[in-house]
Design a protein with these regions (language model features):
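An acidic-aromatic pocket/loop used at catalytic or ligand-binding sites
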Residues: 1-94
Length: 94
């Protein structure tokens, strides 16, 4: 898919559904890779796969989001006190 778990990402939780009109996937993972590098990976993946991509900061998170037709993605990223990067990746109709 367009938005895999980041290489060297350690999945903490994953969930999804294909019921109804919207396929939804949610994955939370941690990585030792710096936050900016992980965010750049998803920004590049979005653009390379024809998605729009916007980066904002809100409530302590870095957020990259975008759409392509009826498909959408959101990446919430933060640096943990331990130094690890934590990412919540949400996709719909990927």
């Amino acid at each position: 898919g367009a938005f895999p778990v980041y290489p060297r990402g350690n999945t903490q939780e994953a969930a999804g559904t294909d019921e109804g009109a919207c396929a939804l996937r949610v994955v939370s993972f941690r990585s030792p890779v710096p936050l900016d590098d992980v965010l750049a990976f998803y920004h590049t993946r979005a653009l390379a796969n024809g998605y729009s991509a916007e980066h904002v900061k809100a409530a302590g998170d870095n957020i990259i989001s975008g759409t392509q037709g009826d498909a959408a993605f959101v990446v919430y990223g933060r640096r943990l006190p331990s130094g690890l990067t934590e990412i919540d990746l949400v996709t719909s109709n990927p």
